[in-house]
Amino acid sequence: MKTFSEMSLRPVILVALFFLAILSSVPRVEAADAMDWPHWRGPEWNGISRETGIVDKWNPKGENVLWQSKEAAGRSTPIVMNGKIYTIVRDQPGTPKEGEKVLCLDAVTGEKKWEYAFNVFLSDVPDTRVGWSCITGDPETGNVFALGVCGQFQCLSPEGKLLWEHSLSEEYGLLSTYGGRTNVPLVHRQVVIISAIVIGWGKMAKPAHRFIAFDKRNGQAVWFEGTRPLPYDTTYSTPVLTTINGQRLMVFGSGDGGIHAFQPLTGRKIWTYNVSRRGVNTTPLVVGNTIYSGHSEENIDSNKMGALFAIDGTKSGDITKTGEKWRVTEWFVGKSSPIHIDGRIYAAEDKGTLLVVNAADGKLVKSLKLRGPVRASPLYVDGKIFVCTSNGIWWTLAPDKAAGVKVLNRTRFTSTEVYGTPIVSHGRLYVPTTGALFCVGGKDIKPKAGKRPETAKETPREEDAEIAHVQVVPVECLLKPTVDGGQAQEFQVRLYNAKGQYLRMAKPDEVEFTVNGPGKIAKGEIPGGAAPRKGWEYSTPKENVHTAVSVTAKFGKIQGEARIRLIPDYNWKFDFSNGKVPITWVGCRYRHISLDFDLLKKVEKESALASQLYIYLMTSFTNSNNPAVTIGKAPQVYNDGSPRRTWSAMLRFLGLLGQVKNVDEAKAKLDPAFAILAREKFVARHAWSAPGGGVQLAVTRGPRKVDGNGVMVKIKTIPKGARSQGWMGFIEGSNYTIQSDIQGATKDNKLPDIGLSAQRYTLTMLGASQQLQIRTWPTQLRMAKTVPFKWDPNKWYTMKLEARVQRSAGGATKAVLKGKVWVRGEKEPEKWQVEAVDESPNIKGSPGLFGNAIDAEIYYDNLTVTKDK
């Protein structure tokens, strides 16, 4: 069994004075030991070390290799802190117990100190991309932070003890995909910040690249903010810290194609520079007040691909036009992050050309072909640039005024690849590869480092004591209401100035709290801790409800907000008769809708096109950004006048793309279907127009709600959300059964895949292969069991998955999973059709859904979750 902790992050009561001490302290950002390397880009976040005496030459076959560790091989860039080297890698690869682990070695000898292993679950990432992220160390506490490919975010002590953890997928909606792109944590003072594409709940149901700041000491969520919704990509650009105009900033590349600057303690956005139509993966480089970065996608203002650019970081707001210092297109700097040396930028293109560029104006000085693609970033130390191609060609270069760079040495790895970046610490060079982690150095190492250059200072907070930002902590939580009263949650109100600097805690009499939803919040003495103290405490309602609550703290004219999900203990039942997908479900709204199944089938008998139009319009109305559209007070407009080309998207879904070229043809094809939907009072009116010669359609929703058999539909109208996971509740759940009526539609003789999840395992009806499968990791199938199972489209079935944790007398633990499917209305079969045992078990996890509706819709009804007796 993996070394999971069974601890859960229940509502935490914290002493206000304790937090005040934490928040008032301002520890140094750099490593306590000047030669430690606590972040993959180094203590200065720029790929530069001030050490000297680093070897020029080495060879993987032995020359200057002090030690190597095959167990530490992988994609990740390691870190070094307090004499230990940390990395994240595959665990027991190719076995039924394969997972992921944090590995700690002695930095001098390579001796293994400890490991912390955990499972990969409910993720499409392949095993070869496990260990994508990098460990981040906290010099103040010595703790390390790790993000696994499936969203397991953990804080570990220097001895490898789990201090706290979050399942970012189940709790917040982190997206884990086949691409494997996983972000890297950033520590700043009392918070640790992590990001991902998040498909959450409530106002965060639509995908966006979002950042969550957790208190590094206890894991409480402090702030939760994001960039523009509906990004095209997951990305792995790491945020870096800098100070500009006396203000501390976190600068990063985003999945929305922009470079952004946020305040790290508040999450408040300071500026945005939009540059790419797809996500930015390079980690920004900050030199003074200038930010350098690149991408290898299409530019937003032309059809040219790729760019290297410089931004003026002193600006604010949307600086797309006002903040650009220079940009050179058709340089494909999309994977490797640049470095800056003596007024020049050294940046590696994806295909392997090293560019040497004047930092001031972007003019090319020289270039060097590196003979292979590059994913790792260059390292500069002791007058040398180290860079390696992904096919294993290692270069040792020296900056040269005339030639750009001078080649000092070149060597090559065999039968290995390089994705991680070399680092240096205490006179030793560490080189990560997929074959081994190498430690490189001379025989008599005498570590020595020069002084780091002075960095810009923050404006003393005493110069601005005016309150400009109110922060309610925790910003998100999940509570269990019961008829007996349920749980309570203490809230803190933290106050910041305009530069995002912490000022103080608010006093109870200074803040007016309001609650939007059931439950109540009261101020007064809160028990617990060393002694009772004054504060605010929210109490759940005395009823078993699935609902969302927001609490708002108003300080003068400024306010802050926190969100609460109320989810009772099992047993649950959902029939979707209210026409809504439960707001508390993570990753479900937006990708699922509720509709009237009786109306759908009635319309389908008259016109298949009208039934498909009903699905499309219901999705569009439900997911509209304009609430007036959802309730029929304003029309939803479809045209091709924006990059999303909503008119073409509708035609594609209806199978009419290329068949309708003007308004007259559109009327001929669609007006009969609209007439049917108008008769049923689902559509109030629709209108055609032709602005600029193109087709435009405006549709206003009618008064009809879901008044027949309400069902939930996994829709295929969202191409990037057609295959997805969803989660329904708390992650501590174990030993329960999930059951639902399900139906799969068909299109072009293709069927969807339909699944229910329990305890991080999924029972899936596979459409194309006509199989029934229990699994935990779809792309690895380490413990999966599969049986033939023929099923038909447009037919209701009942699906049932049972998850159990079994512990033997000797202490061994395993998970036992059982699944069955039968035609709805028929007698439930006594025998389970598929059973699986996992000797490396998931011992807890949220109930949930899996669906692959790329080919056709999926319908759910009468869903239940029951606790085992």
Predicted segments with their positions:
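Noncatalytic, solvent-exposed loop/strand surfaces
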Residues: A31-E476, G485-Q492, A498, I567
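Extracellular carbohydrate-recognition regions
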Residues: D36-H39, I567-G641, M650, A668, ...
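Short flexible loop/turn segments that cap and initiate beta-strands
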Residues: G486-Q489, Y496-P527
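Extracellular/luminal low-complexity segments enriched in Ser/Thr/Pro
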Residues: G519-H546
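Short tryptophan-centered beta-strand motifs in secreted/extracellular beta-sheet-rich domains
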Residues: F576, S740, W796-G810, L817-G819
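Secretory/extracellular carbohydrate-interaction modules
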Residues: D598-K602, E606-T619, T630, D707-G710, ...
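Short, aromatic/His-centered strand-loop micro-motif at the edge of beta-sheets
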Residues: P778-T798
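Flexible glycan-contacting loops in extracellular carbohydrate-active proteins
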Residues: E828-I858
